[in-house]
């Protein structure tokens, strides 16, 4: 690592291999920094993944871009999650398109308890509209797993946007 001195103070720069959180202690004018894995610091971790981004606009209709809607939903979710004790990591908070491997790596490296992908789709039949929650049927947490999470999220989002819930669907291999 290195450091930079400015009028505001000293900036410490570290090159770390992996994702870490930190704790600091200032004692007798000495600064102690501990780097911890996310699981060492937080009881509950989720990864929020707004699909598309950057040059991948996703579906477009009436001037609305899927990538923008996905990101807007993620930012609204971030506002709510920032007020809880749940640690949330985001695959993107700007108009960029991370590689799929990087999106999955974030969930794996943080050892996330939940991975939530936000994705807006279209349908050939314009009378079909609403929210569909897709879950990973092979992943199970006793008492509250993928199915339960998908159900709660779909109902809550449908209620908050005064929308229509279409139900739950188990993800197929091509969805991963």
Where are these regions (language model features)?
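Catalytic-core environment of secreted peptidases
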Residues: 39-64, 116
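Active-site-proximal helix/loop segments of hydrolytic enzymes
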Residues: 64-176
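Flexible glycine-/small-residue-rich
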Residues: 16, 35-37, 50-52, 118-120, ...
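Signal-peptide-cleaved, periplasmic/extracellular N-terminal interaction regions immediately downstream
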Residues: 1-46
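Short beta-strands and strand-coil junctions in structured, solvent-facing domains, enriched
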Residues: 19-23, 55, 123
């Amino acid at each position: 690592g290195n450091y930079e001195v400015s009028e505001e103070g000293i900036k410490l720069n570290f090159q770390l291999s992996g994702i870490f959180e930190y704790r600091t202690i200032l004692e007798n004018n000495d600064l102690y920094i501990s780097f911890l894995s996310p699981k060492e610091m937080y009881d509950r971790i989720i990864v929020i993944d707004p699909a598309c981004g950057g040059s991948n606009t996703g579906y477009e209709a009436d001037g609305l871009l899927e990538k923008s809607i996905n990101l807007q939903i993620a930012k609204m979710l971030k506002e709510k999650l920032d007020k809880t004790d749940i640690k949330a990591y985001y695959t993107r908070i700007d108009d960029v398109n991370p590689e799929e491997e990087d999106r999955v790596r974030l969930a794996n490296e943080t050892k996330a308890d939940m991975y939530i992908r936000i994705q807006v789709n279209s349908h050939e039949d314009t009378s079909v509209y609403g929210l569909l929650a897709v879950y990973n049927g092979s992943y199970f947490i006793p008492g509250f797993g993928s199915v339960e999470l998908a159900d709660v999220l779909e109902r809550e989002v449908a209620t908050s946007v005064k929308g229509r819930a279409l139900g739950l669907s188990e993800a197929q291999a091509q969805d991963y």
